[in-house]
Amino acid sequence: MKIGIIGAMEPEVAHLIAAMTNASSQTIAGIEFIAGTLAGKDVVVTRSGIGKVAASIATTLLIEKYAPDAVINTGSAGGFADSLSIGDIVISSEVRHHDVDVTAFGYEIGQMAQQPAAFIPAPYLVEAANKAIAQLGEVKAIEGLICTGDSFICDPVRTKTMLEHFPTMAACEMEGAAIAQVCHQFGVPFVVIRSLSDNANNDSPVDFDSYIVKAGYHSALMVMLLLEQLDPNSVK
């Protein structure tokens, strides 16, 4: 079993890379891919860069060059669920674009033309993540809708509009739906694991800078615990 792990920023992958053994690296198109062992599993970890295009490039290269059995997207997010605090975790129940609008042609808001409205993670990956929750200690984790767009959300007016479109949204970020769409295209199972760095409000820029390391660590911890729960025979 080989698992691809993608984070956008250095704090989102640093703890994973530090915990790897037998690591070797290869750089393709300016993106470093580090292969090795983590939590007893063969993994390839990469820092994609920020945003949907960067994430799509990294995911495509990862799948084409390393043929992972599954892909995990890890990192930080802005929180929308009232039950969560900074540092808590959202496991994707589904992933959607929040900045796509081709409703003029009969698609749902957030649905890219000729694509599903929502990208659904592999049940066995979500199950492993849920099993890992018990080991998180005081960090809370829930399943929920994660939405993606090429904007850092800190405007209350925009937040209100997003919640009108996606009332069950638990978190938003800038890569997950792009990674999910590429995985969907290639038929590769995925899950998105995000820890909250801010609450998508006026304080978000300050909160993000203050808490990105904490969020990156919590998300990385969740990924490592998830890997420990994975049964190599469960790939489907």
Curated annotation (Swiss-Prot):
SUPFAM superfamilies attached to this UniProt entry: Purine and uridine phosphorylases
GO molecular function terms listed in the Swiss-Prot or TrEMBL record: adenosylhomocysteine nucleosidase activity; methylthioadenosine nucleosidase activity
UniProt keyword Hydrolase present: yes
Residues annotated to bind substrate: G78, I153, M174, E175
Keywords annotated in UniProt: Amino-acid biosynthesis, Hydrolase, Methionine biosynthesis
Catalytic activity reported: S-adenosyl-L-homocysteine + H2O = S-(5-deoxy-D-ribos-5-yl)-L-homocysteine + adenine; S-methyl-5'-thioadenosine + H2O = 5-(methylsulfanyl)-D-ribose + adenine; 5'-deoxyadenosine + H2O = 5-deoxy-D-ribose + adenine
One GO location term (cellular component): cytosol
EC supergroup of this enzyme: hydrolase
Pathway(s) it belongs to: Amino-acid biosynthesis; L-methionine biosynthesis via salvage pathway; S-methyl-5-thio-alpha-D-ribose 1-phosphate from S-methyl-5'-thioadenosine (hydrolase route): step 1/2
EC number: 3.2.2.9
InterPro entries: MTA_SAH_Nsdase (IPR010049), Nucleoside_phosphorylase_d (IPR000845), Nucleoside_phosphorylase_sf (IPR035994)
Active site, renumbered: E12, D198
Gene3D superfamilies in the cross-refs: Nucleoside phosphorylase domain
Pfam families named in the record: PNP_UDP_1
GO BP annotations listed: L-methionine salvage from methylthioadenosine; L-methionine salvage from S-adenosylmethionine; nucleoside catabolic process
Keyword Hydrolase recorded: yes
Similarity field: Belongs to the PNP/UDP phosphorylase family. MtnN subfamily.
Main function: Catalyzes the irreversible cleavage of the glycosidic bond in both 5'-methylthioadenosine (MTA) and S-adenosylhomocysteine (SAH/AdoHcy) to adenine and the corresponding thioribose, 5'-methylthioribose and S-ribosylhomocysteine, respectively. Also cleaves 5'-deoxyadenosine, a toxic by-product of radical S-adenosylmethionine (SAM) enzymes, into 5-deoxyribose and adenine.
Annotated HAMAP family: Salvage_MtnN
Protein name, UniProt field: 5'-methylthioadenosine/S-adenosylhomocysteine nucleosidase
Species this protein is from: Shewanella sp. (strain ANA-3)
The gene coding this protein: mtnN
